[in-house]
Amino acid sequence: MKHVFSKKRAYLLLIAVAANLGVASAEDFESGGIHYTTTTTDGSPSATVIKGSDAYSGDVVIPATVEFNGGTRKVTAISAEAFNGCIHLKSVTIGSNVISIGFKAFYGCEELEEIDIPANVKTIGYNNAYTSHPSETFVGCTSLRKVTLGSVTSMGKSVFEGCTNIVTVILGEGCTVIGNNCFKDCAKIKTIEVPNSVKSIEEKAFENCTALTTLTIGDGVTSIGVEAFKGCFHLRTATLGSALQTIGHSAFEGCEDLEGIVLPDELTTLDYDHGYTSHPSETFKGCISLESVTLGKKLANMGSDVFLDCTALKNVTINEGCSIIGNGCFNGCTKIAGINIPNTVVTIGEKAFFGCTALKTINVPASVTSIGSSAFQNCTALTKATIGNGVTTIGNQAFQECTHLTTATLGSDVRSIGFKAFYGCEELEEIVLPDELTTLDYDHGYTSHPSETFKNCKSLVSVTLGKKLANMGRDAFMDCTSLKNVTIKEGCTIIGYGCFKGCVKIAGLTIPNTVEIIDAEAFYGCTALTAIDIPESVTNIGGMAFMGCTNLTKATIGDGVITLDYQAFKDCIKLESVHIGSEVKTIGHQAFMNCTSLAEINLTDRIATFDYDHGYTSHPSETFKNCTSLTTIVLGKRVTAMGTGVFADCTGLKSVDIHDGCELIGKSCFSGCTSLESVEIPASVTSIEAQAFYGCTGMLKAIVGDGVVTIEEKAFMDCSKLESITLGSELRTIGFSAFRNCVALTEVVIPDYVTTLDYDHSYTSHPSNTFTNCAALKRVTLGKRISSMGAEVFSKCNNLQQIIIKDGCKVIGSKCFDGCSNTKTIINNCVELPETAANAFSNYTAALYVPAEALATYKATEPWSKFGTISTIEGGVPEPTTDKCATPTVTFAGGELIFACETEGAEFVYEITNADVKKGSDSRVKLDCTYQVTVYAKKDGIENSETVNYKLDLLKMVGDANGDGVIDAADIVTIVNIIKTAE
């Protein structure tokens, strides 16, 4: 922005100054073509050159003195804007008495080619009233080529800024200051020699002097200001004076051709000025040709990002006296191969050597107490790091991704190692953590951040942990895939979250008896671990702590453990034996899920919960789901509720002992337990939840205790061998499909307190199907209080022969007995007719027996009136006759199974299982081409036959395709037919 300072304003300032000095008002006059105003200097009459009514042009000579009113006055000043806009001014000779030149004095003098400011001039620029105002004294002098400064001691801002044709600058020995922005953007200056008299080179004095190649700074200069030489791209040589004490931030930033720099011993600061307290130093940032740096003896703090991205820097000499290597000091200096850190250094700052990709070794002396975050991160050539005994703190990510680091020796006093400190050091083979170390963790600024201190150190084989390391931190050794030997010393109390997760070669580990917590995922996926002994000191085993330890065969859980959290041993497929300590109270959801080799487990009396943790309130329990080798379960006395799917798909489970005290059998609790033969539910249980015994195809008998109030939907569905069910006296609700497809069930007695045979409220449009397709069911007794009945409750029970309805039953629902084609007698004891759906029955050939007093009503009311025979109960009810299908036979010939039965018109229901479809973990499996066949015969109106089991050994004789015991041409025909069928 250009500031216009008018002649009138200049006069007002001169008048104000005169008034303050108690002198007469100034008078303007003209002499020799130059305009003046009267002033007083040091008590003597003087004159100041001012702007005339016409622009000055040509060659102007300002005399030493001028005559006015008969007296002689010294010409002591050139006022502000005196020659402003004099575009045809060629030259100016300044008189010997001029001591000051005002701001914008020669602004826009486009033809002025040279200016020689004599030694008598002390001030160029602003006056005291405008100390922050840019001087711009020669701004816009676009033809100016040569400048000579004599003994200037005070200089305002931007005196020669933007004079793009200045080539030569001569600074006199009396000059003491080079002001802010003085030669900024003077793009043709090639050399600068600063004399010894100069004390200060101020902010941006030579910024963007892009042609500058050589700089010599005299021994008198004590400070170089902020960005003083920033952007001098072609500066090749810079010689700094011996008295230099301070260099401001970014002073030489972007000097891309600068090759070397020697910082004098008196230098104490490479930093920002106080106006930029949060600004990085960046003093030599981006000096991409800089190869050599020597730092002075008194430079204690090197400042932040001082040599950032000096990509050619090879040789760095840090003299003793340096105490701080600042944040990012050598960040991105990709050619530093080695550096000697003197034993005066106390702190290595954050990112001090970040990305020094040529650095091979580092020796941190004992004087250093702190290594900052990311100090050596991404030093990919670093092979060896020795950390002195004085270091107490290694910051976050200090050596992260030092991918070739093979040896790291830690000093004895290291107390804290930050998160990801050695993350990704893929060639690090061994680490010994000192006994003083207390923390492998994040700093307080990252309280939720995982430690990951040695994560992904893929070559790490051996780790020894110190005595004072109480908390090992989260994910500290995660994915150290070569780690075999771990020594945890007494003193450790917490094995952190994910600490050894993915360490696939840890085969054994001793956990000391000081450990109290094994946190979540601590040993997740340690696939070589074969046994674990958890001491009594441990109180909590976290979620997924040993999940996926696929070779773990034995686990002993100490008596101090109270909580065994979610998925703690999930997918430990070879785990055969688990001893659970006497104090365990809670086993979390899926804690032993998919432990397919687990044959036995001791569930102690203190265990109260098989459930999810509080973080997964909607998650199924599934604690022992798919433990296919588990044969027997005895529940402890304090288990009050078994959560969802606790023993689901335990296909080898044959018996379960549910103690009196358990109140809830959860959803899908025993679903898919195909070997479970019987279950007795004690009176303490009040609810059997949905699908609790769904698909227990081996169950023969179930006794439901008198305390059970609710059996939810599908609770015993597909229990295909269930022959007998005893329902407790307090039962009130049976949910939809509760006993659907229980094809072996022969009789059902609905207790008198049952009010509902129905769907739950989530399925209001769903048919009940409570006993649908119970193909062997012969007799049904409906209780006294049934008031709600959904559709199709006993549909497709095609062998149902007798229905007994007790007096008090209020309703018989839609299609209740639909498809019950073989019903012979219905004994309805209801004096008051139940509300009966029009389609409740599909077979009206059965004999209906009703109370004598209601006989007429039944005969007059549909659908009861549709029955062909309606008699009174008092007249006697005959016992139903029972016929049964003959037992089927099974033969194999011509590549086919052939079923036969003596009962005419019988159908066959069979199931064929190929025994070659196997699950296991053995290294060798014999394929025997064996098929297991189960079959029974059925026919409407009579009882199903007995079930036949048939074993077929196919092709036992090699080549005997048709199974006739002889290998001949007939076998070839059979094989061809089999192939054609397959195609």
Residue ranges and their predicted role:
Residues 2-12:
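Bacterial N-terminal signal peptides that target proteins for export
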Residues 11-20:
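Bacterial N-terminal signal peptides
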Residues 24-28:
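Boundary at the C-terminal end of the N-terminal hydrophobic targeting segment
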Residues 33, 55-77, 87-100, 110-126, ...:
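Structural signature of tandem-repeat unit edges
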Residues 79-82, 103-107, 135-139, 156-161, ...:
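Consensus positions within tandem repeat domains that build extended binding/scaffold surfaces
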Residues 876-957:
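Short, compositionally stereotyped local motifs that mark structural "simplifiers"
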Residues 961-983:
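Alpha-helical segments with a strong preference for the paired helices of cellulosomal dockerin domains
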